[in-house]
Every structure is written in C-alpha cells, then in structure tokens.
Swiss-Prot record:
This is GTPase Obg. Residues 159-330 form the OBG-type G domain. Residues 351-429 form the OCT domain. The gene is obg. Pfam families: DUF1967, GTP1_OBG, MMR_HSR1. Belongs to the TRAFAC class OBG-HflX-like GTPase superfamily. OBG GTPase family.
Length: 429
C-alpha cells in the first residue's frame, strides 16, 4: 500500500524549570543561593532514510513529542536534558507547514538531517542570579516552551526517468523488461496503483525509472488516480511519453498523446520544458502498422522530435532508446548534482528565525476588561513564575509595564482600573 501523505503535530520538549534553593550546612554558615537550572527540552529532527519507501509508519500517529527537560534541583544540580526525537522519512519527502503551506524542507538524500522543532532552553535557578548587588536572589525562571508545528509530510518519489502514458500504454511492462523487476501487469485500466521504481543498467551506468500511473483525461482535475500521482513527475530529470499503437488499446494514438500533453499543461506546464522522449510501444502487435503511420503523420505537423518505436515486452529497439537517455543524462549529471547540493545546503541544519517587530495589542473582552498581549509578553509570562515578589518585579521590567499602563491611560483607562495579561489581573497605578 502506498502511503504518501500525512499530517502530524510535532512538539519539541519544554525546558525544565529552574528552582529557588538555599544552602543550609553547618560548616557553611554564609549559606547562599543553591538552586540549579532546568535541563534543555529535546529537539525534533527529520532524517532521510533510503530504506523507507512510504509514510505508513507515520500515517496512524497524530502527534510526535520530544521529551521535556527535567527541573533543576538543589545543590546547584542541573536537570537532565530531554531526549531528542528523530523522525525517519523516505528520500523524496517534502514537509510543509499545514497552516501556511510554506515548504519547510525537502529531504533529497539519505542521511539528510533537519531540525524542525527546537527544544526549549532550561530556566535558570536562583544561583544564576547571584551578583554583587543581589547576594540572596529570590529569582528563578521556568523553562522555555518547545517549538510546535502542524506539518504535512508528502512523498514525491525521486527517479531519474519517469514513464508517462495512458493506462495500457505498457509502462510497467517496459520497466519490468529493462530492470528485471516484477511489477504487476495486465490488460485493464489502472493495473499500477502506485508509482513503481526499477533500476535500469546500461553500459556500466544505472538510472532509476519510475512508472507513473493513473493519468487519464482530466487527471489534473482529480479524475482517476491522476492527481495523486502527477506530483511524482516533478522530480524526474527525463520523461518517457509511452504511447501504445496496438488496436486493442487505442483508436487514435495521436489523440492519446495529446490527452497526456493537455493534462501536463493543466497540472504544471513547466514540466513540458524537460527532455521528453516520445516512444511508440507494442510495435510487435500485428495491427500496429496503421497506427504507427497515423501517429507519425500527425506528429510531424507539430514537432520534429525523434520518435522511438519499440516493443517493451520483447525489448525490440530498446537499446537505441536507452543509449540516448544515458547519453543525455551524462551531459547534465554534474549540473544536476551541483543543483542538488545547493538545494540541500539551502536548508540549514538550524533554522534561522525571522525577526518580527513585537506588536502589543490592547483589546477589551466581553466584560469590558482591557486585555494586553504580544509575543514578548507571552514569552516572559511563561518564563517567569509569580512565586516571589522579586520574580513579579522582574516580569514587570521585562514587559515594560510602565509603558503598558501609560498606553492604557491614553486609551481612557484610569488609575485603579483592572487589566488582564493572560489569566492574571493587574491594576493600573
């Protein structure tokens, strides 16, 4: 079964909380702060694995979460870091943000590693805050929250050569014949229900061929299985457009050719700019000659491309086709390898966050209470516990409480009026 798309909620581990603790030992009368820091939360990584060929291992999971860091302890003990999570995916998997549809990363080679959710840093214990001005700090921090994302995983098979054509064009038979694989074949619609890959060897070189199934008229609009599988064409360097000339398969092979071309145009016309080998198949059929002549006559009116005539089943004339495919591949190999390396390098191992201006919003809730919020305020609300007066004072400094209160006054609020940050009420001074 082909499982090539799924959506998962991913969460990195939260950082552990720092603690407030005091040294109380008979031989150390000075005492002092002794609270340790929290451990770092685990990261979530994506890693390419060429041994996988579908997303079935992820299909039935709703979420994947890394381990939280442990809280700090007394005696300056730092909490244990949370374990990282490594999600293995097949090579060819594209991961997008399911909310924004932004592509996050393309996994293009085995071993490629990408940090998709970063674990939160551990919070500081009170020992961290000791200074010449504050020798007994009653301060601590909670750990940072781990990053989260709802991500869509979509597998687009990576192949050097993709075989296109209507059902019964003989794509699976040709891949079987050239690669000595054993794909299911028969003379009925949609024999192949998922992209099938075969390695074709020729003159000490090898290329991966993919049989792309399900393309019929209106495939680009979702008819048949076409829309699900057209996407696999996008990664192929070359395409073979296979057209059956057997009477049992077609009334007009040129019309069959145009059907596929129109579907490619509607799906993504850029695909037509790639090298496409036009191949008439099943020339071994006794009734094929008239269809061959009909196709060649009509095709010459629109193109001067070379048309190959083969029998995939009997391997007739296939060497000529392979010779030209491998020759063209060698011409472009270095360029494609360079482009692949550049693309992989464009996905840095550690994401670079886009800095955004922090905008503070002031809105009234259903009870006419002012609600103040921003990313910075939410961050420090989560980081600083309100368990000591010093922590509360530090929170107010971090969010610039004086500026918030002045803005509320400018909006008509008065001294003594209440306002809310997250779930905590404050009064304007």
């Amino acid at each position: 079964m082909l499982i090539d798309k799924c959506t998962l909620f991913l969460r990195a581990g939260n950082g552990g909380n720092g603690v407030i603790s005091w040294r109380k030992e008979a031989h150390y009368p000075e005492g002092g702060p002794w609270g340790g820091d929290g451990g770092k939360g685990g990261d979530v990584y994506i890693i390419g694995d060429h041994n996988l060929n579908s997303l079935i291992d992820l299909r039935y999971k709703k979420k994947i979460e890394a381990e939280d860091g442990e809280n700090g302890k007394t005696k300056l003990a730092t909490g244990k870091n949370g374990n990282d999570i490594y999600i293995k995916v097949p090579v060819g998997t594209t991961i997008t943000n399911s909310i924004t549809n932004e592509v996050i990363v393309d996994i293009l080679v085995t071993g490629q590693k990408y940090l998709i959710c970063k674990g939160g840093m551990g919070g500081k214990g009170n020992a961290y805050f000791k200074s010449s001005k504050n020798r007994i700090p009653n301060l601590c921090e909670n750990g940072e929250l781990g990053e989260t994302i709802e991500a869509q995983f979509e597998l687009k098979y990576i192949a050097d050569v993709g075989l296109l054509g209507l059902p019964n064009a003989g794509k699976s038979t040709l891949v079987n014949s050239l690669s000595n694989t054993n794909l299911k074949t028969a003379n009925y619609m949609f024999t192949t229900l998922s992209p099938s890959l075969g390695v074709v060897n020729f003159e000490d070189e090898h290329l991966v061929f993919a049989d792309i199934p399900g393309i019929i008229e209106d495939a680009s609009n979702g008819s048949g299985l076409g829309l699900d599988f057209l996407k696999h064409i996008e990664r192929c360097h070359f395409l073979i457009h296979l057209i059956s000339v057997a009477n049992i398969d077609t009334e007009n092979p040129f019309k069959d050719y145009l059907t596929i071309v129109e579907e490619l145009k509607k799906y993504n016309k850029e695909i037509l700019k790639r090298k496409i080998f036009i191949v008439l198949n099943k020339i071994d059929e006794n009734d094929s000659k008239d269809n061959i002549n009909l196709f060649l006559k009509e095709f010459k009116k629109i193109s001067n491309k070379k048309v190959y005539q083969i029998s995939g089943f009997f391997k007739e004339n296939t060497n000529e086709l392979l010779k030209d495919i491998f020759k063209d591949y060698k011409k472009h190999k270095e360029q494609w390898e360079r482009e692949l390396e550049e693309k992989i390098n464009s996905y840095s191992l550690v994401k670079v966050e886009k800095e955004q201006e922090d905008i503070v919003t002031y809105e009234k809730d259903e009870n006419r209470i002012w609600v103040v919020s921003s990313k910075r305020i939410a961050y420090w609300f989560n980081r600083i516990p309100f368990n000591t007066d010093e922590n509360v004072t530090r929170f107010m400094q971090k969010i610039k409480m004086d500026e918030i209160e002045q803005t509320l006054k400018d909006k008509g609020a008065k001294i003594g009026d209440s306002f809310r940050i997250q779930d905590v009420m404050f009064e304007i001074n």
